[in-house]
């Protein structure tokens, strides 16, 4: 039976992604000045205006918010007033206030930590029990062997397309391109990803903002030659593959002038393209004490190491927290029947080799540093520059699994 899988990606100039980039650029500047900053910053961008609001706790950081916002807009490419939104002339409104002391206090001293005696706090196993989760919630991490980066194929291909559009725009190779763009890829298989013997691209959709002086015919020809065929493996394309290039027609008005953008509205683009569940929490603008972000990264780290160890072809890791508590309230592993051990035994292995307390995650992945602006576009996963993409625990997991099999 044929099964269709679709994912989309949006460019760094898409208004929602611009908002994410601004929020993460501000986060990075706070962390650069004060690594223990607590930050939750949201951005709205619209015609001629950016609005930044949120909660911050930083004792020594002095961030020029206006400057950071304008530099972020400049980097993305909104540099002309006739775009309806630009780095120099658009207004920047700021409403940032202090983090709630009630939230800050429960994160600083977790419920478990408050109940310990000084002697208990000094024990090695409690080193990372001081910091509590910044909120309740559930987070998912996923890995699959269908691509070298252990990501679902449709989202991987969609990100390639939008990255390529940005490269061609910034290099001047296609001078009519403008910052706002989207791509969507539909992959068809004759079964589940781990079972399929045939895979090809059924449909590609590209919508790209452009200048007024280019024809639809020129855009279509360039997208096929310089974008699609440059980044999509030829063996995945067939004579039946369908292409829709700017199917709405002209796309001159774009970016925040065409659509208002908000931080956190592209959570499926940011993760696995709809291949697996999502807990609902966005990433951008949040410091790593917010488990919406750090625990989702850690769940990916766990899932990727499971697959890299050869213990499953697909792995979904779900972790959940209560605000103010250090230890997760639940952890679940689902390998979709591809595991070399039962999911329950794999979950036991995960608990033995990974520490999902927020403070432990921050320490292990070195998250209190300015690395977040680069996550804002083209996905947070499947990119080797990020620490949660390491597979440094795969060998230990493999050995532990072998020992369990021998004991059975």
Swiss-Prot record:
Binding of K(+), residues: 42
Reaction(s) catalysed (UniProt annotation): L-methionine + ATP + H2O = S-adenosyl-L-methionine + phosphate + diphosphate
Protein EC: 2.5.1.6
Protein's cellular compartments: Cytoplasm
Chain residues that bind Mg(2+): 16
Pfam families recorded: S-AdoMet_synt_C, S-AdoMet_synt_M, S-AdoMet_synt_N
Region (Flexible loop): 99-109
UniProt-annotated binding residues for L-methionine: 55, 99, 259, 290
GO biological process terms, semicolon-separated: one-carbon metabolic process; S-adenosylmethionine biosynthetic process
Classification via InterPro entries: ADOMET_SYNTHASE_CS, S-AdoMet_synt_C, S-AdoMet_synt_central, S-AdoMet_synt_N, S-AdoMet_synthetase, S-AdoMet_synthetase_sfam
Pathway assignment: Amino-acid biosynthesis; S-adenosyl-L-methionine biosynthesis; S-adenosyl-L-methionine from L-methionine: step 1/1
Cofactor(s) essential for the protein: Mg(2+); K(+)
Swiss-Prot/TrEMBL keywords: ATP-binding, Cytoplasm, Magnesium, Metal-binding, Nucleotide-binding, One-carbon metabolism, Potassium, Transferase
Cofactor note: Binds 2 divalent ions per subunit.
GO molecular function, one term: magnesium ion binding
Top-rank EC class of the record's enzyme: transferase
Function noted in UniProt: Catalyzes the formation of S-adenosylmethionine (AdoMet) from methionine and ATP. The overall synthetic reaction is composed of two sequential steps, AdoMet formation and the subsequent tripolyphosphate hydrolysis which occurs prior to release of AdoMet from the enzyme.
SUBUNIT field: Homotetramer; dimer of dimers.
Name recorded for this polypeptide: S-adenosylmethionine synthase
Species the sequence originates in: Deinococcus geothermalis (strain DSM 11300 / CIP 105573 / AG-3a)
